[in-house]
Amino acid sequence: MAKKNAKNSKNSSASIARNKRATFDYKFEEKLEAGLSLMGWEVKSIRMGKVNLSESYVFLREGEAYLFGCTIAPLNTASSHVVCDPLRSRKLLLKRKELDKLQGLVDRKGYSIVPISMYWQKGAWVKIEIGLGKGKKEHDKRDDTKDREWQIEKARTIKKAVQQ
């Protein structure tokens, strides 16, 4: 029996998880890439796609950044001798200059730090894209929805005109 080709495997895509709610609720001014400090069972679970970023956020404590609220469900077979906490806070690996910049903006200007997506880099490293931004008001969300619907309607109209 032949082995599966790694390129055709379902788990070989670079993207692991996306926080779709983040782009709807926040207007990002800057995006950063950060590494994650993970345990072995977490990496195995991430490879199987058992991760949820929807209610997670980043907080800064004692000069370090932590990812909180990210759920990584443990596999039944991967961790029999280790106590697995799916909601534990995970340390983000950022440079000191980036941490200082984030701390200053969060403290002084009221920015929020929210995870946007999690992905594989070079097939071995789990990276997380975090966004630095402010929360949108209700009218901003409505404006974005109107713009998106207008773009879809415009594309449909153009497509119909080209087909005729």
From Swiss-Prot:
Required for rescue of stalled ribosomes mediated by trans-translation. Binds to transfer-messenger RNA (tmRNA), required for stable association of tmRNA with ribosomes. tmRNA and SmpB together mimic tRNA shape, replacing the anticodon stem-loop with SmpB. tmRNA is encoded by the ssrA gene; the 2 termini fold to resemble tRNA(Ala) and it encodes a 'tag peptide', a short internal open reading frame. During trans-translation Ala-aminoacylated tmRNA acts like a tRNA, entering the A-site of stalled ribosomes, displacing the stalled mRNA. GO terms for molecular function: RNA binding. This is SsrA-binding protein. The gene is smpB. It comes from the Bacteria. It is found in: Cytoplasm. NCBIfam families: PRK05422.1, smpB. One of its GO terms (biological process) is trans-translation. GO terms for cellular component: cytosol. The keyword Cytoplasm applies. It comes from Shewanella pealeana (strain ATCC 700345 / ANG-SQ1). CDD domains: SmpB. Keywords: Cytoplasm, RNA-binding. Belongs to the SmpB family. The keyword Cell inner membrane does not apply. InterPro entries: SmpB, SsrA-bd_prot, SsrA-bd_prot_CS.
